[in-house]
UniProtKB/Swiss-Prot annotation:
Keyword Transmembrane included in the entry's annotation: yes
Entry keyword Oxidoreductase: no
Cytoplasmic side: 1-8, 75-93, 143-147, 250-263, 325-330, 376-424
Name this polypeptide is given: UDP-sugar transporter protein SLC35A5
Organism: Homo sapiens (Human)
Length: 424
């Protein structure tokens, strides 16, 4: 691998440039998304609009974009004949995309809940727990190996997050920060005003629908009474598991078998179709959602921030798809850590976030654990990455390594023996 890269420095430099560019785009979009979710809330840290409308619109934007590009790809490669007939196996492969779509659907909804309870800085710090869940699924689902240093760094990361949670007990009353006042695009109609006036306590029905009752934790357990777990902490742990499962399964079906050589835009079209389906069912089956859309309209409560959030969420999802297709999950998780630094800085400057001394002492431990994990990639033969070779429909031979961060590589020798094994 190294010799091939050295013999083609131009190709290597372009690959590195594209990798850094993709990572930078993902970081910018992820940071913008968190900030826009926070800015789109009202003064009470609730949402005047239905968050599901943001998700269904972003899925629609992604689907339209991918379908248009897919038609261009199919027309260019003269593959229109593949659209005429569909076997049972193709239908089964198509239905596989419903699983990550459903998980992404849950993940995108939980984000709105989390930021109703936590400061953006605290949310991104606690989201580092996804490194642990992703590493576990890496080992179980994708059969990727981790050495003992990496496992130790994951344990340190977990303990750092627990300590950080305990250190925020003095900020529980103001974790969500302050809300914002902004003008909506559409003024409510008479039927909408009547609908809102009929809500209990003259409150916004949407706001009541999208909040959890206050929960008190550790009221009986004295051993862990100093750890102040709130609803926001529980939700973000659940989100870490869901997002890790979604990304791991998505990477698996993006790269398995013949899917490896299929266009990413065709694959994403299947994923986003189910995304629209699940979000649309949520809007249609939930009575409160139907009543609000019927009386106030689909875009009631939306502002410039929520409209911008639709497009940022869409393009952030596309960037994740490119990372999972051409890189891997660990690159995605490690790039997300840069978002932690950005959001923490913005929270101090904008959201009136005042970190305590414990925060400054414990937050670097989280980032240090991440650095140790990334710097301790196994180099010994025991953990050598497994090589897979796949031939596409045009006869080109491709090679993919299962190691962290390895990219898909085309083998240029047309008559190379596929049974030969590379030595490392």
């Amino acid at each position: 691998m190294e010799k091939q890269c050295c013999s083609h420095p131009v190709i290597c430099s372009l690959s590195t440039m594209y990798t850094f560019l993709l990572g930078a785009i993902f970081i910018a979009l992820s940071s913008s998304r968190i900030l826009l979710v926070k800015y789109s809330a009202n003064e009470e840290n609730k949402y005047d609009y239905l968050p599901t409308t943001v998700n269904v619109c972003s899925e629609l934007v992604k689907l339209v974009f991918c379908v248009l590009v897919s038609f261009c790809v199919i027309k260019k490669d003269h593959q229109s004949r593949n659209l005429k007939y569909a076997s049972w196996k193709e239908f089964s492969d198509f239905m596989k995309w419903s699983i990550p779509a459903f998980l992404y659907f849950l993940d995108n909804l939980i984000v709105f809940y989390v930021l109703s309870y936590l400061q953006p800085a605290m949310a991104v710090i606690f989201s580092n727990f996804s490194i642990i869940t992703t590493a576990l699924l890496f080992r179980i689902v994708l059969k990727r190996r981790l050495n003992w240093i990496q496992w130790a760094s994951l344990l340190t990361l977990f303990l750092s997050i627990v300590a950080l949670t305990a250190g925020t007990k003095t900020l529980q009353h103001n974790l969500a920060g302050r809300g914002f006042h902004h003008d909506a695009f559409f003024s409510p109609s008479n039927s909408c005003l009547l609908f809102r006036s009929e809500c209990p306590r003259k409150d916004n029905c949407t706001a009541k629908e999208w909040t959890f009752p206050e929960a008190k934790w550790n009221t009986t357990a004295r051993v862990f009474s100093h750890i102040r777990l709130g609803m926001g902490h529980v939700l973000i742990i659940v989100q870490c598991f869901i997002s890790s499962m979604a990304n791991i399964y998505n990477e698996k079906i993006l790269k398995e078998g013949n899917q490896l050589t299929e266009s990413i835009f065709i694959q994403n079209s299947k994923l986003y179709f189910f995304g629209i389906l699940f979000n649309g069912l949520t809007l249609g089956l939930q009575r409160s959602n139907r009543d609000q859309i019927k009386n106030c309209g689909f875009f009631y409560g939306h502002s410039a921030f929520s409209v911008a959030l639709i497009f940022v969420t869409a393009f952030q999802g596309l960037s994740v798809a490119f990372i999972l297709k051409f890189l891997d999950n660990m690159f995605h998780v490690l790039m997300a850590q840069v978002t932690t630094v950005i959001i923490t800085t913005v929270s101090v400057l904008v959201f009136d976030f005042r970190p305590s001394l414990e925060f400054f002492l414990e937050a670097p431990s989280v980032l240090l654990s991440i650095f140790i994990y990334n710097a301790s990639k196994p180099q010994v033969p025991e953990y050598a990455p497994r090589q897979e070779r796949i031939r596409d429909l045009s006869g080109n031979l491709w090679e993919r390594s299962s190691g962290d961060g390895e990219e898909l590589e085309r083998l240029t020798k047309p008559k190379s023996d596929e049974s030969d094994e590379d030595t490392f």
